[in-house]
Amino acid sequence: IETPGHSRAVILSLKNRYNKYKDIDPAKAEEFVVWDTKDTTNYISVQGYSDNVLNLAVPGTYRFVKRIIDELESMFNQAGVKLKTVHLGGDEVADGAWDNSPAIHEMMKKNGYTKIRQIEEYYIDQITEYLEAKGIKAGAWQEAAMKHPADFDKKVAKRIQSGRSNSRRS
């Protein structure tokens, strides 16, 4: 799976799902909202999109990613095979993708974060912890595993396998 960037198909599909259920089952509609409805950020990804990054400050993002992991695990189990690794992506998140997201700014304030990178670290921690509890290793591109504080690196290094991407993001 590719998160939080490269998620345009997910976002567009989940917006259609939201519109399908918003009037008949609002709770179901809200379950997988992976965007901040009040976000006014304008960004362009290296792929040329302005709508391809999951918002890491909304609960629907975590519910959705965990559901995908659960579904993958179920499919592997049905095939009689252990799911050993899930690659989370982590590369090519457009610079400034969350600049005007009230949800991001609220999360930063609530948690005492001073950098957006700390929200990305929170996301990596939450999802790799979820995978670890299931006995599944996490994989990610190098960007997801670099430039973190030493204590975070130690914590996550045992959970994540990293590889290089061709991203232009530093």
Q: Which role does the model predict for each range below?
A:
Residues I1-K134:
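Substrate-binding cleft of carbohydrate-active enzyme catalytic domains
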